[in-house]
Amino acid sequence: MHAIYKFTHDGKQLVQTIGTPTVKGADGTHFNRPTFMSWLPDGTMFVADGYNGTRVAKFDKNGKFLLDWGQKGNPPNETRPGYMNNVHGIAVDPVTRRVFVNDRANHRIQVFDENGKYLYEWSMGAEPSDIHLLYMGADRYIWAFDRGTSKVLKYDQEGHFLYSFGTWGDFPGGFWGVHGMSVDQDGNFYVAEVDSGRVQKFRPRPGANPAYMVSKPVYSAWH
């Protein structure tokens, strides 16, 4: 807890640790229950920190701390720009370098430049009720998962809803508490489910419309 670990692709060797394991904090060497991270093509990384940290932390590709931003506000659900309540998802545009932050408990997405300057936001409203994570691939659309409806959702960068798929279930192909999702260079889509304790892999169907498929990732220098 409170740390990020980097392993070799086969998972056998730990090659880097960012943060101080088991020690919480809010600075360049400590996190407070971080949730997700995202990368720019040059390897610059952004950490959503997180359940208790309520901030975004920026690092270079070598793990050197650069800056952070965000605060909880008073009361905890204060919704002025830059105030957050459960930073639970983050995605970065590889072209504009804008940072999209899932302000989960405030039911909104806040958008910043890469150095934390507030740009704009959009509200999720009552539905979807519980956005858990964000992902942006090479197509530069935003994909999210809503635990309330067990659906994967697609948005443009202004927050316009475009498409969704998925249904609740513990059967193959159903979603039950998705808490992580990713895509590999072949277009295979992976979801990690906290409630079922499983990882599912979906292969792209030959001839499928790319608009309905979660985009392949942007290559990162953090490898």
Regions found by a protein language model. Name each.
Residues 1-223:
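Eukaryotic scaffold repeat domains enriched in small/polar residues
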